[in-house]
């Protein structure tokens, strides 16, 4: 229902977010312009191979050209996937450390049998925590008018979040003896 409302509201330069909040967006003038915007964005993201879970978390925000909130929703989708895979209820760095950190992580992105693989696991933890710190925390606390997010930057971040989703999907649950 929200998607149908947002299609109509796009002509007034408005959109309803998943939270139910009404926000401003760049207005479209014609139905073909609204369709073109959505099609171009889908094509851009499809050409990058963006993970479908990323798109499902921020579809409405992208259609409304609301890149600020699209980034927030996409990054939140990573934490949600980690919680789903592990059963943990934490958030942010604590969630990442509990799921991917230590000598016997709950989720491993590789066999953890060499120093290089252990280093890669630590690097993935740092990537996740850095992304949460830079994009989720910033967008959650900074007003949108002070924190600009261009379409190009949003697409780049969505590609990185897509990589995170693929790595989390492929992660194994090593023995925790």
Predicted regions and their residues:
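Amphipathic alpha-helical interface elements
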Residues: 3-131, 145-148, 152, 170-177
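Amphipathic, well-ordered alpha-helical segments in soluble domains
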Residues: 73, 131-135, 160, 164
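Short helix/strand-capping connector loops at secondary-structure junctions
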Residues: 134-146
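Structured adenosyl-cofactor binding patch, chiefly the S-adenosyl-L-methionine
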Residues: 154-171
């Amino acid at each position: 229902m929200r998607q149908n409302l947002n299609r109509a509201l796009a002509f007034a330069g408005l959109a309803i977010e998943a939270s139910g909040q009404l926000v401003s967006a760049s207005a479209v003038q014609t139905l073909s312009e609204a369709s073109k915007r959505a099609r171009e964005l889908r094509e851009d993201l499809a050409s990058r191979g963006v993970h479908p879970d990323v798109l499902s978390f921020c579809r409405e925000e992208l259609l409304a050209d609301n890149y600020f909130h699209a980034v927030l929703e996409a990054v939140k989708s990573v934490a949600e996937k980690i919680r789903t895979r592990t059963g943990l209820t934490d958030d942010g760095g604590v969630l990442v450390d509990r799921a991917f950190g230590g000598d016997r992580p709950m989720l491993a992105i590789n066999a953890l049998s060499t120093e290089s693989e252990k280093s890669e696991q630590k690097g993935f933890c740092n990537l996740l925590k850095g992304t949460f710190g830079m994009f989720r925390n910033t967008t959650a606390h900074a007003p949108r008018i002070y924190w600009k997010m261009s379409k190009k930057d949003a697409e780049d971040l969505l590609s990185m979040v897509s990589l995170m989703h693929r790595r989390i999907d492929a992660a194994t649950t090593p023995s925790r003896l």
